[in-house]
Amino acid sequence: NKTADGVINAKDYVSEELKLGMANAKVSTTNVAISIPVTSAIIRVVTSPLMSDDELQKAIETDSLWENLVQLTDDLNEYSIFHQVISRNNKTNTMEILFVASKLSDVNAYSSIVKKAGLNPVILDVKCFTLKNAFDNSFKIENKANNALLEIGSEDNYLIIVHDNIPIITDIFLRPNEKDLLGQFDGNIQNTDTESVVRRYCMPLK
């Protein structure tokens, strides 16, 4: 598996495969949307004093808002930051903000892979939100409160639940051999190794 160590470590291979896939599918457009792994992003819902949109923008421009609300180990300038006001509460004089920070080095690396394949990245999003949007657009379910999205992959393993419009993301640690066992799991526990993985895997989901 040439991408076993991650897509970024197999740039040339992935670019060539993208070219081949686009040619085989006879896709003519070159504008594409790409998603980066959850592991390349910092996702938090933070509580802030209630502000208007103008006040929020001014606080962001001075860098004071994120420095006070989000303690990052690296310089803010090393991240591409997206934010969205989720809710405002006049009674408590607070508001909830979705904060998403992606390492610029990772953003540039994934963009370069796509560009090398002759494509033009026009939209970039974190994969968990891309999957959620695809789910929302594909399945017209009235009550989405009882639904969750689960991903097990080479780079990401997480569960995402949206409660009161707030995304709750739980990372799940799995060893490579455990991913293989779960990938083969068909609902019937056939051996003690599989049973052990399934039981441990289910614990963070409860």
Predicted stretch roles:
Residues N1-K206:
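Hydrophobic/aromatic-enriched cytosolic interaction surfaces used to assemble or bind macromolecules
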